[in-house]
Amino acid sequence: MNIKNHIKQMLLGAGLLLAVLPSEAQNIIRPKIAGPNGLWVNSYNGVLFFGQTDMETQNSQMPMQLRFYYNSSAQSTNYGYGLGFSLGYEMRYRINEIGGVVIETGDGRSDTYKKFGKEFEAPAGVFSKVEEYESGKYRLTEKSGEQYFFDDAKYGKVTAMTDRNGNKTIFTYQDSLLVRVQDAVGHTINLSYTDGLLRKATASFHKGSISYEYDGLRRLKKRTDALGNSTLYSYDKQNRLCEITDANGHKTLIAYNNSGMVSRMKTDVSDKSIRYEGDKTVFIDYTAPQ
C-alpha cells in the first residue's frame, strides 16, 4: 500500500507544506510524519519515536550495532535505558491469557500470534512465523530467513539470533539486563549498569566508551561519546521527551497536545505543526524552501 494514496490534499508554496492524512486507512500501514533530526510521528496516534545508533561496525560482513529507540507512549516504561527508551536487540515475548505469543521488538512494535492447537497464526500483514520448537522455547522466523530464539522463560527475552546464512549472535543477561552481545565472527558489545540503568557501553569494534547519565526520575538526561561530545535530553511533566540538545548546542523542541499527541517539532531551521481532526491528520511544514 503506497502512502501517497492516503494523501488527500497537498499544497506546496511559499515555504508551506500541508498534507491531510485520513486515519481510517491505518489498519496495517500507518503513514509516518518525518520530523527533524531523525524524529518521526505516527499520524494515527501522534506517538513520537526515533532511533539512535551509538556504535556500529564498519565494512563488516556481519554488521553489529548498538541502537536505541525512543517511544513517547512508553514514557512510564523503563527497560534499563531511561523511561521511554529501549534497545534494538531487546526483543521480548510473553504468553497472553489465551495462550497466544506476544512479541515486542526493540523499536516498540508488538505483534500477537494467536494459538490454534499447536500452531500460531500471525496477525494480518505480518509474514513472520512463531513456533514452540521445544517445550517452553520459542522461535520467530522472518520472511527473509532471520531467526530469533527465546529460550529463557524467566526473562522472556531473545537469547540468540541467526541470519539467513546461519551465522549466530548470542545475547547474555544478568538480572534481566542485557550485558553482552557476541556474533559469529567475534564482535562483542559489553554493557555496564548501576542501579538497573545502563551507565557505560564498550565494543570490540569501537574505540573508547559511551556513557549515560539519568535524572532522579530514571530518565536519560545525558549521553557522552568517546570524544567527550554530549547530547542532552529534557522532558515535560508527563515524562515525555520535549527537548534534545546536540553537542553543538542546537536544540530540537517537541510539543504535545492535551491528548499527549505530538503537535509541533521545531529547530533553528525548521518548524512543523500537526493537528488531529477527527478522521484526518493535518501536517503543516513552515520550513522555508532552500
Regions found by a protein language model. Give the residues of each.
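Extended charged/polar low-complexity repeat regions
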Residues: R30-P31, L66, F85-L87, R94-I95, ...
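Intrinsically disordered, low-complexity segments enriched in small residues
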Residues: M1-L83, Y89-M91, I95-V102, G108-S110
